[in-house]
Amino acid sequence: LECRFLSFLKLFLFFNIFFGCFVDIYYLCRRAPLSATTTMEKNNLISNLKRYFGFTAFKGQQEEVINNLLKGNDTFVLMPTGGGKSLCYQLPALIMEGTAIVLSPLIALMKNQVDAIRQVSENDGIAHYLNSSLTKAQVDEVKNDIQNGRTKLLYVAPESLTKEETKEF
């Protein structure tokens, strides 16, 4: 897992340095891949789409991307602003075991993403972010929610990855 995570981190840095653009890089740490190829599983995917996001159908390549992630495949997605990238990593994170890590350089975007997920959930701990804006007490709350299995999505600022307490966690 560590080697694959470092590959994603390198991809994140490559886009930010060479293309001068900010991108969210999604890394899904999972024990076992899922498959969403049967009709029943496809219906389950659609029902989860409606449950979490209120949509009855995917747009563009979202379903293909999500199925690829659910199968445990590394997936690179390049879509325009408003193309539905966030849903491509949020839905798999919400329906699979474990916590998904999203690297994002923009604190405001992290907050918006977390707020949006929390609006559709009964559990405020379902999504968190770790960045320089948090107090020690808030960081402890985030870590507690992750350790207790309440958090499905964790948005992390790249600079947070260099802190010893984050590395140890």
Please place each PLM-identified region on the residue numbering.
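Generic detector of intrinsically disordered, low-complexity, polar/charged segments
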Residues: 1, 17-18, 51, 79, ...
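Conserved P-loop/Walker A NTP-binding site and adjacent catalytic elements of P-loop NTPases
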Residues: 60-169
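Arginine residue identity/basic-tract feature
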Residues: 4, 30-31, 51, 118, ...
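Helicase-associated low-complexity/disordered flanking segments
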Residues: 8-75
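Extreme N-terminal basic, low-complexity initiation segments
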Residues: 2-8
